[in-house]
């Protein structure tokens, strides 16, 4: 399951194992006009926890159909399943939380699973900075931003 936006998927492709697996492109979307990070300019201290929380809530609400479709796809397979976005933190984290929730994980376990991704985030950003769209990341201030390479995963403006 690939949760990257269409521009991300086109630019970086499916990777070296792409031809060996089945593939479901299920991009998480967030309409720019409902993106609290785009509609509220952060101050010099970065984004407030409330604003980041609002971003997560809005992405989850806007992508609810994608989350359900991904859960249904996993339920249909009799083998391993892999799901990812570009960094494996925000979109992947939202989906992982939903998956863990439906299989009965406790809230503390879900939170711990999400927090575990923080330990490798700098290495992930280092990798993404050299990706074909890395110029976008190199120009972004990452102070508190949930990973979203400046609109690559969002729906285009209408």
What spans do the regions from the language model cover?
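Cys-dependent protein tyrosine phosphatase-like superfamily
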Residues: 1-82, 94-158
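Ser/Thr-glycine-rich phosphate-binding loops at phosphate-binding pockets of nucleotides
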Residues: 87, 91-92
């Amino acid at each position: 399951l690939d949760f990257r936006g269409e521009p991300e998927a086109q630019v970086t492709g499916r990777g070296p194992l792409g031809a060996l697996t089945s593939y479901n492109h299920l991009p998480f979307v967030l309409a720019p006009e409902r993106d609290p990070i785009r509609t509220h300019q952060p101050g010099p201290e970065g984004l407030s926890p409330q604003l980041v929380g609002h971003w997560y809530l809005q992405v989850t609400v806007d992508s609810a159909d994608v989350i359900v479709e991904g859960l249904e796809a996993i339920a249909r397979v009799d083998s391993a399943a892999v799901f990812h976005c570009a960094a494996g933190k925000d979109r992947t984290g939202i989906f992982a939380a939903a998956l863990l929730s439906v299989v009965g994980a406790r809230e503390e376990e879900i939170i711990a699973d999400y927090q575990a991704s923080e330990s490798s985030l700098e290495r992930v950003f280092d990798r993404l900075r050299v990706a074909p769209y890395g110029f976008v990341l190199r120009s972004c201030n990452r102070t508190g931003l949930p990973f979203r390479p400046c609109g690559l995963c969002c729906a285009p403006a209408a």
